[in-house]
Amino acid sequence: MAKKKAFIPFFYFTSIVFLPWLISLCCNKSLKTWITNWWNTRQCETFLNDIQEKSVLEKFIQLEDLFQLDEMIKEYTETDLQQFRLGIHKETIQFIKIHNEYRIHTILHFSTNLISFVILSGYSFWGKEKLFILNSWVQEFLYNLSDTIKAFSILLLTDLCIGFHSPHGWELMIGYIYKDFGFAHYEQILSGLVSTFPVILDTIFKYWIFRYLNRVSPSLVVIYHAIND
């Protein structure tokens, strides 16, 4: 009976880990057809954001330049000009299809992530007792570690998150989140987040050492500073 009770929190933790993947898989299959039909029927003429609008306008400017080039080439025969115009027309249709698919993809991913967040929030709320048990296990495990291992683990974690090479990792992670939500890649926003997050984490971590570790385990702080130096 005790083993069964101990297995329930572990099963709950495993379900939390794999539940987002299952929700994403189910939502992508069930929502894709509905969103595609809704979008194509609605035929919306507004852009989702200014970044996408700028990208589309740049594409149409390129097509306009091609049309101007078409007018400049007068020495071509009428047949060649018709073929040239037909090629531009096909490229325009293909571009519109690609842009339409991109916008459907954006709505699908945003809706899927929103549904996943709501389901996980409700799942976590109804399983608070199991989360408390898991938290007690983690605290007991950390308590049994030596101060040297704790200091080494803290140093390793901080170097990974706010160390010298951390901006590249933040860039990859934030870029993945952007892509997962279906947002367009915007270099200025990405650079701003990459340069801001490590600074915020570093400030929070130093405050945590000053307020919590100095009070709970002064020896751990001494070992941490000795290893860090």
Swiss-Prot record:
An example Gene Ontology cellular component term from the record? chloroplast inner membrane
Q: Identify the InterPro entries for this entry.
A: CemA (IPR004282)
The entry's keywords: Antiport, Chloroplast, Hydrogen ion transport, Ion transport, Membrane, Plastid, Plastid inner membrane, Potassium, Potassium transport, Transmembrane, Transmembrane helix, Transport
> Per the record, what are the reactions this protein catalyses?
K(+)(in) + H(+)(out) = K(+)(out) + H(+)(in)
Protein name (record): Potassium/proton antiporter CemA
Family membership noted in the UniProt record: Belongs to the CemA family.
Q: Where in the cell is it found?
A: Plastid, Chloroplast inner membrane
Q: Name the source organism.
A: Nasturtium officinale (Watercress)
The main location is plastid
Q: Which GO terms describe its biological process?
A: potassium ion transport
* Family annotation (Pfam families): CemA
How the protein sits in the membrane?
A: Multi-pass membrane protein
Q: What does this protein do?
A: Contributes to K(+)/H(+) antiport activity by supporting proton efflux to control proton extrusion and homeostasis in chloroplasts in a light-dependent manner to modulate photosynthesis. Prevents excessive induction of non-photochemical quenching (NPQ) under continuous-light conditions. Indirectly promotes efficient inorganic carbon uptake into chloroplasts.
Question: Which residue ranges run through the membrane?
Answer: 6-26, 107-127, 189-209
